[in-house]
Amino acid sequence: MSNMVEIDGSFGEGGGQIIRTALSLAIMTGHAVGITNVRARRTKPGLQPQHLAAVRAAAAVCDARLAGDSVGSRALTFEPQTTAKAGNYRFDIGTAGAAPLVVQTVLLPLTQAAGASTVTVTGGTHVPHSPTVEYLEAVYVPLLRRAGLDVTLSYTNAGFYPRGGGQMDLVIQASTGPKPLVMNERGRLEELRAFIITSNLPEHVAERGAVTVERSMKAVGRKIIIERRERPSPGTGAAAVIVARCQQGMAAFSAIGELRKPMEKVAEAPCREFMQWWKSTAACDKHLADQLVLPLSFATGLSHWTTPVVTEHLRTVLWVVRQFLSIDVELEEHEDGSGAVSLSPA
């Protein structure tokens, strides 16, 4: 076992992203990791059930020894005993905890396994403070595939707060590692798509969402494909997602329905975020900018991408990666808040 990497969980954004990134890196490098001050900057610090689900999922992939793996724990030790093992995995978060975040914790390590793996995660697919499953399906996974990783994702049931019960299914093939990606500029807009997702709601709710999107996106001057998705779910819920696919760049914007929040308001929110991004020159949205760091840290050459905003999440994930890997990192920050990331092997 390699020397333990010590991570201060209060660094930067001080939330669950530090835990998930460190777990993935521990599996992929073989280093044990000790995390203190877990989620120190959150109103409820320490491990919560959805973070514990990510810890247990990561441990299953590499037979890790664990200490501090309990709800409320503010210190965690994770010691991989093997490299990532191919297998058929099922992880049940048991709540409306974010299934996409558990997926992102184990996905990249399993591309290093000796064979193909299947992963099924049940929990929340459309919940606050997490990518939606459509975000992974339409942006994150396609970019992994562009980088040469063989990953497919589908989902049947949607999971909304508080019931959860959504299901995501992945097939992950073994890979020799990602190729670098360069997204200096977004290039020509090739496809604009909207997803209107509803579960156990009257048909007019989805219709109102679609009408709102069509009206709100007229200023772009491009045809938008609107796909309505009625998904089975233990509870009720709605979401709207806007996806832009360009020659180089990609971006997506999501909003989740809430009790007594009209569908028009839900659908307007991602349209408004898209328009803000569209006025910038960035190739990626601000969330994709930090989600690309982990996979492209293992790429064989120089990767470069631009972001409309340099977020604390981006600074934090770059810091965590540098605790494990010897890579050259350059983060440009401009006066207007936008920036660019460059990563390459040292």
Regions found by a protein language model. Name each.
Residues 3-29:
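N-terminal basic/disordered segments at the start of proteins
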Residues 29-46, 116-120, 155:
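Glycine-rich phosphate/pyrophosphate-binding loops
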Residues 52-152, 169:
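A generic, well-ordered mixed alpha/beta core segment in the N-terminal half of proteins
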Residues 65-69, 116-117, 148-158, 217-235, ...:
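Flexible, glycine/charged-enriched surface loops at secondary-structure junctions
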Residues 84-87, 92-96, 112, 139, ...:
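Phosphate/diphosphate-binding glycine-rich loops and adjacent basic-rich segments that engage nucleotide
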Residues 129, 146, 178-180, 185-286, ...:
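Conserved mixed alpha/beta catalytic, RNA-binding, or beta-rich assembly cores of soluble enzyme
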Residues 307-346:
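C-terminal functional modules
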